[in-house]
């Protein structure tokens, strides 16, 4: 159950951080206005709390692993929301990052 919970928290973290950054981007770069920016800031703040719910006690480990989730999640967000089409190098890089996440978070430690 610990791994499943951890993975779900990574997904929630990705949605809150990437979604928040996207909302700020839309508000500023796409001139959608301050409401979008404010919503984005709220989502980004929520992301900060989600990370604290991870079962591992080490901040550095969690944030390092989340970096890999962020890479893959950002590409997925781009596909789903902005019509981005990743090339094979994007996909290979994301796969390498996710492998790193698995090693950092779920390798058996002695």
From Swiss-Prot:
It is a multi-pass membrane protein. The keyword Ubl conjugation does not apply. InterPro entries: UPF0060 (IPR003844). The chain crosses the membrane at residues 8-28, 33-53, 62-82, 87-107. Keywords: Cell membrane, Membrane, Transmembrane, Transmembrane helix. One of its GO terms (cellular component) is plasma membrane. Belongs to the UPF0060 family. HAMAP family: UPF0060. This is UPF0060 membrane protein Francci3_2786. It comes from Frankia casuarinae (strain DSM 45818 / CECT 9043 / HFP020203 / CcI3).
């Amino acid at each position: 159950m610990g791994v499943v919970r951890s993975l779900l928290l990574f997904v929630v973290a990705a949605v809150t951080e990437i979604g928040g950054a996207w909302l700020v981007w839309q508000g500023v770069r796409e001139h959608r206005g301050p409401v979008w920016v404010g919503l984005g800031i709220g989502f980004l703040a929520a992301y900060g709390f989600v990370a604290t719910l991870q079962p591992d006690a080490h901040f550095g480990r969690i944030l390092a692993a989340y970096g890999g989730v962020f890479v893959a999640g950002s590409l997925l967000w781009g596909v789903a929301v902005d019509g981005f089409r990743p090339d094979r190098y994007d996909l290979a890089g994301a796969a390498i990052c996710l492998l790193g996440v698995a090693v950092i978070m779920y390798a058996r430690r002695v």
